[in-house]
Amino acid sequence: MSVEVFYDDDADLGLIQGRTVAVIGYGSQGHAHALSLRDSGVAVVIGLPAGSKSRPKAEEQGLRVLTPAEAAAEADIIMILAPDTAQRALYTDSIAPHLTAGKALLFGHGFNIRYGLITPPVDVDVAMIAPKGPGHLVRRQYVDGKGVPCLVAVEQDASGSALGLALAYAKAIGGTRAGVIKTTFTEETETDLFGEQAVLCGGAAALVQTGFEVLTEAGYAPEVAYFECLHELKLIVDLMYEGGIARMRYSISDTAEYGDLSRGPRVIDSQVKERMRAVLGEIQSGEFAREWVAEDEAGRPNFAKWRAEGAAHPIEETGGRLRAMMSWVDRPITETA
């Protein structure tokens, strides 16, 4: 591989086992990190606001829960796993006052460091450990003696051993069993945002909705359009997930593959590629981050409007009716109430 990859033999759990880790947040990643750290012999405290609904769950799982400020004061290593938009205030109010020399500040995503929303003091280590999978998978793989690949990055190495500490943390949550890839805060943040906006979320959702619209506007039944443009997408993505695009093409019919090869580049053409480059440029320049922070601080008016418009799209009502016919699909509470 062209990147540096670390495994179990490259990481020393001893670098973290003698120190206290505060996990700030107890959502998808927070619970997986905390429980796996504990099971790896690391002293863990959880930082949650007094009124957090996650406090009872963490306590039931045998973890000691403090306020974020109390956890930051007690810990040697502080892992922030709160949402991006909550991190700056959380850091300023609860963590910064207790971030004394020699401590380490860790992140699961580089957004706030990359865009200067958080500026740690120069006498602390700053690193990132980012599992490339949801928290439930991170935890399940750890319990099964396996692991989820992680990204690791060091932004600030005050101690001279920040990378070693980050690798020890990754090992404690199972990452080095699978492999830990070295990156930077900038690379992780920019590629993560681009993937979300241009491909995984924004690109895929827009492609599916537009395909549905083209078929229904041409007079085809919404139910059939839903199957062809959304439902069957999972079959294709699963094949890609298992073996890449080549595996998908090997597995589909020759008719489907010919249509893929001959028509796909007409849909996603050079103009689309240029617009994708423009999206990347907004990420690299900080334009997107500034826009999103301002939107959040203004109460998210555009976000709320766009979310409501998406929920009202005809594909949602059609999909709800069709999913009711599929006993194998776990339907959300909003569709089963």
Swiss-Prot record:
Binding, substrate: 253
Pathway of action: Amino-acid biosynthesis; L-isoleucine biosynthesis; L-isoleucine from 2-oxobutanoate: step 2/4; Amino-acid biosynthesis; L-valine biosynthesis; L-valine from pyruvate: step 2/4
Record domain KARI N-terminal Rossmann: where: 3-183
Entry's cofactor comment: Binds 2 magnesium ions per subunit.
Cofactors that this protein relies on: Mg(2+)
The organism's taxonomic lineage, starting at the top: Bacteria, Bacillati, Actinomycetota, Actinomycetes, Micromonosporales
Native source species: Salinispora tropica (strain ATCC BAA-916 / DSM 44818 / JCM 13857 / NBRC 105044 / CNB-440)
Protein residues bound to Mg(2+) 1: 192, 196
This protein's UniProt keywords: Amino-acid biosynthesis, Branched-chain amino acid biosynthesis, Magnesium, Metal-binding, NADP, Oxidoreductase
Transmembrane segments: none
Its EC number(s): 1.1.1.86
GO biological process terms, semicolon-separated: isoleucine biosynthetic process; L-valine biosynthetic process
GO MF entries: ketol-acid reductoisomerase activity; magnesium ion binding; NADP binding
Domain of life assignment: Bacteria
UniProt catalytic activity: (2R)-2,3-dihydroxy-3-methylbutanoate + NADP(+) = (2S)-2-acetolactate + NADPH + H(+); (2R,3R)-2,3-dihydroxy-3-methylpentanoate + NADP(+) = (S)-2-ethyl-2-hydroxy-3-oxobutanoate + NADPH + H(+)
Active site per the UniProt annotation: 109
Domain KARI C-terminal knotted: 184-329
Functional summary from the UniProt entry: Involved in the biosynthesis of branched-chain amino acids (BCAA). Catalyzes an alkyl-migration followed by a ketol-acid reduction of (S)-2-acetolactate (S2AL) to yield (R)-2,3-dihydroxy-isovalerate. In the isomerase reaction, S2AL is rearranged via a Mg-dependent methyl migration to produce 3-hydroxy-3-methyl-2-ketobutyrate (HMKB). In the reductase reaction, this 2-ketoacid undergoes a metal-dependent reduction by NADPH to yield (R)-2,3-dihydroxy-isovalerate.
Similarity comment: family membership: Belongs to the ketol-acid reductoisomerase family.
Name of the featured protein: Ketol-acid reductoisomerase (NADP(+))
PANTHER family referenced in this protein's UniProt entry, alphabetically: KETOL-ACID REDUCTOISOMERASE, MITOCHONDRIAL
Residues annotated to bind NADP(+): 26-29, 52, 54, 84-87, 135
One annotated Gene Ontology cellular component of this protein: cytosol
Binding residues annotated for Mg(2+) 2, in chain numbering: 192, 228, 232
